[in-house]
Amino acid sequence: MVCSLILWILLRLTVVRRYHGGLEHTGIYVGSNQIIHWSENSKVETCNPEAFLQMGGDLALSIYVSCIGSSQVALRARAQVGHGIDERGPYDPLVNNSHRFVIECLSGQECKEDLLVKDPIEYCKVYLGADNWRVWDRGN
């Protein structure tokens, strides 16, 4: 049952996150085994789940997915693929990071720096009604 629940979630387009060493990286799952995220290379990129886990040279163990998704959020993420420094400025781990990208995809608005004190999970609750996360079992 968990397997079918995760599959159902992944068919719905959703926010994903991973942890390693106390740090978190977030992105938008857009279907077809693809995640869009704002990378440390200052570029909005598409990658597969395995590459997402290895961002920054670390090897996180799990990807967590929100149990509610949105096609509008996925469209916003897709529209930014290829954007870089000219469109978004340089990547900054404190203020111009993957969380900011996800918040902007969720809200449809430019994220002001003072909003970054909140966790993207809070925005998932507000914009998607998502308050539950599951580990993505990529083996099934």
PLM regions and their residue ranges:
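Glycine-rich catalytic cores of cysteine/serine-nucleophile enzymes that process amide/ester linkages
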Residues: C3-V65
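Activation targets extended, charge/polar-rich intrinsically disordered C-terminal tails
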Residues: A79-N140
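Aromatic/basic micro-patches that form nucleic-acid/chromatin recognition or nuclease catalytic surfaces
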Residues: D58-I85, G89
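Feature targets compositionally biased, intrinsically disordered low-complexity regions
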Residues: M55-G56, I68, L128, R138
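Intrinsically disordered, low-complexity sequence elements enriched in Ser/Thr/Gly/Pro
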Residues: V15-V16, A74, N132, W136
